[in-house]
Amino acid sequence: MGNLSIRNASVTYPSQRFGGAVTALKNVNLEIAPGDFVVALGASGCGKTTLLSVLAGFLTPTEGEILLGGQPVLGPGSDRGVVFQKHALLPWLNVIDNTEFGLKLQGVSKAKRHEIAARNLELVGLADFHKHMIYQLSGGMQQRVGIARALTCNPAMLLMDEPMAALDALSRETIQELLLDVWDHTHKMFFFITHSVEEALFLGSKLVVMSPRPGRITNTYDLDFNKRFLETRNARAIKSSPDFIKMRETVLDIIYGDEREAGEPAEYQRA
């Protein structure tokens, strides 16, 4: 499929409250290659979700362009899967029917879509839950179904908008590790939004820090903590290592400095 390229993307909304218009994103540039796990970190209102919506094709940038494999992104498409903070699963369908729903809309045969959905449910650890209804699952399991569903149409890229924000700490850690296994298995592009500095450092192969509104990318870091986890399976040792702690403090210093400069309240999580 090729890279996803964000070129001078800006988004401006009409707003009576802010004197006619508010700029959510300003001149954002970023290159995401196949196999990159990009995590965006920034204050509430800095434009993270706006950027994800532009990548998903839900919004059109006021200026600039988004290219995927050299082709302009003009709307939603099966080449990009989206996982939201709230799972958005269909409560009247069971787990496997939810997972294969996108393939059904594409006209894929029942046998083929069942095969693909079952494979992705196995990947997220839900091989024994095909017939369960959504209300019978925990929050973490529901998000696993959401991930499996997003994978089922074989997108080039997964877009994730704080998918673990509502989970308890243990479920959150479990899903973090699951995501890295999925990333390692599929080699897809990931674009992930979070308020947690620790989560950002643990998951990302590339971290982008965004300024308060108008959202710009102020800092970019290449990371390898995720690869260390895949090699060692010891998340606690990685998160308590001196270089992880040093990077966390570096990022926090940037974030709090940006917020003081903008006069915005600090709302970041260390963990």
Set out the residue ranges of the language-model regions.
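The feature captures the beta-strand-to-loop junction immediately N-terminal to the Walker
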Residues: L41-A43
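Helix-to-loop junction immediately C-terminal to a conserved catalytic motif
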Residues: A56
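Conserved ABC transporter NBD signature motif
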Residues: G64-P76
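Short helical segment in ABC ATPase nucleotide-binding domains corresponding to the A-loop/adjacent helical element
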Residues: I96-K104, H114, A118, D222
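Conserved ABC ATPase "signature" region
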Residues: A111-F129, D181
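Conserved ABC ATPase signature
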Residues: M133-L137, M141
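A short, proline-enriched helix->beta-strand linker immediately N-terminal to the Walker B motif
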Residues: T152-A156
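Catalytic Walker B motif of ABC-type/P-loop ATPase nucleotide-binding domains
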Residues: L158-D161
